[in-house]
Amino acid sequence: MNLISSRIGFSRRALFTGAAGSLAASSISNEVFAKPVKPKKKQLLLLFLSGGASQFETWDPKPGTKTGGPFRAISTSIPGVKISELLPQTSKIMHRLTVVRSVNSNIPDHFLGHYALQSGRSVPGYPVLGSAVAKLLEQPDDFLPGYISIRRDGPKAYTDVGDAGFLGAKYEGVRIVNNQSPENLIAPLSVKPEITNLVDRVRMATDQRFKMGRNSNPIASYGITYNQADALMKRKEIFDISKESQSDHDRYGKHDFGQNCLLAKRLLQSGVTCVKVTHFDWDAHQDNFYWHQIRCAEFDRTLVTLLNDLSEKGMLENTLVVITGEMGRTPQINNLGGRDHWGRAWSMAMAGCGVKPGIVYGSTNELGTEVKDNPVKLGDLFHTYLRALGIDSSLDYNINGQTNPIADPAAKPIDLLLA
């Protein structure tokens, strides 16, 4: 199938209805394809294991080999499939997961790997997954930001990739730090609603006059930012995890990742289209086994709690959960007891809507040095994410009259993973 030209079943009407906030956004034509109406809104939760989790200590253990490390492999709820003993709770719900053991990104670099992971591209300037999904799943009654990224306070660098590219400011990720509400959501008591409404009318009229004869995109960017802030002020309670029960705080874990996932659940329940939660400190160039015991203990418990809650609330069937870092870690153990960057053979997982649960796709060789079968590229995963969410990944953006594929046309969805 020609991924660029395959458009059967879609009417030509405005897919991009929102104002854009960058110069390039002015070139997005309304002549693009609308997504089909869905009975329930699809949502995306990206659990990002920042730094690159070791596949040997998580999804693809190699016990008893020179690359395997000290940990055992344990049985799971999928007969014949084993994962690391560092994920004992996850082993009990493997029948809910879709695991890919054959990712070959060949990008052993944090920043480049993170961008390629999120955009499915190696060329800069394309929207990352959260921004693309926020746009492509946008509904007329959405008023909250479509993409919210949650992280702890700390190093930024590659962890803050959230570029909407040519989609504009409306689809940039809103960043939440330490599960706290964005600053200044509470209006001063002296500001009365009737005054705010009057100021809004004056502002919009002034904007319209100012835009005459000028490039309107920078002005639109300010307006979009203002409207998003106004929407957040009206729904500031969705960020307040103190409203969650003490037992929920305990179940999710008192660490940053646990509390941030608790907030993510609230945001998804409130209708946010895409939420990303970053779990830090997987970049174990030294003392890899010590650090993975700590990180896996946090991740294991919180992941299972979150998936169970989403399932019990009937949300998992409409939410795609993606669990991945930007790379894997070397089979070789260095002289500091660490594992270094590795992009040639690593693992990730998914759960929820649109993917087949209880399967393991692809494999690596005995030492985990190379992909043995069913190699997967990051572009393939990007197509697969979109398809799982009910989005035709062969659609095009239309920019200045030229088509620009939503997903890399050199890649394709992994049909065997799709439900």
Feature locations, PLM:
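Ligand-binding pockets and gating/stacking loops
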Residues: M1-A419
